Amino acid sequence: MIVYDDTTPEQLLERIEGADIIVTKEMPVNGDLIRKFPASVKLICEAGTGYNNLDLDAAREMGITVCNIPAYSSERVAHTAIMMILNLSSTMQVQMKMLANGNHDNFTKNLQVPHVEVNGKTLGIIGAGHIGKAVMKIAKALDMNILVYTRTPRADEDGIRYVDLETVLKNSDYVSLHCPLTPQTKHMINKETLALMKP
């Protein structure tokens, strides 16, 4: 095993000479590069969830298997998504800035900072893989209504409704995007779809 802290696409061909397996993390590996790989390479492993940095068609053409780590940091990403929702609803940043600036009167009286409770609010989740499911679990614990759009139709579960994308966007107070970046999902959220959302 040979490990490099950092490799550019330009350095890759030299560094993989004689390798059977390549493990990479988010480095762009396009088709032109993959087609130049030595015949010894049989597997490219993306050390993360996303693999949009790899040309899958070129790898298939060269007989190279590609894999990823679907559960990589799923809980951490889910926590971050929920943390952002809670931050938006509590305006914590505004409160902390007021406090830091010595604005204790308005801070303690809550005159300038409206609070929004997330319980009872609707969370729209786009993508129901490892991360989407982890977000659902936390949102259920927060007593949120949950709408989910996924490319694979599913039956509703306790507290979770699977619906089309338009329904998610029109009815959600918050939307959390957790689908892979593919040609089908790129620009899924755009000016037109954002216009469907609540003001």
Residue ranges and their predicted role:
Residues 111-199:
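Rossmann-like dinucleotide/phosphate-binding beta-alpha-beta segment
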Residues 65-71, 162-165:
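Short beta-strand elements at the ligand-binding edges of bilobed clamshell
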Residues 2-7, 24-27, 101-110, 155-162, ...:
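Short gly/ser/thr-rich secondary-structure transition/capping motifs
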Residues 31-34, 54-56, 78, 135, ...:
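Short glycine-/acidic-enriched loop or helix-start segments at secondary-structure transitions
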Residues 49, 71, 129-132:
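Glycine-rich NAD(P) Rossmann-fold beta1-alpha1 loop
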Residues 1-67, 170, 190:
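An N-terminal-biased, well-structured beta-alpha scaffold segment characteristic
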Residues 62, 70-122, 137:
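Phosphate-binding beta-alpha-beta segment of Rossmann-like dinucleotide-binding domains, i.e.
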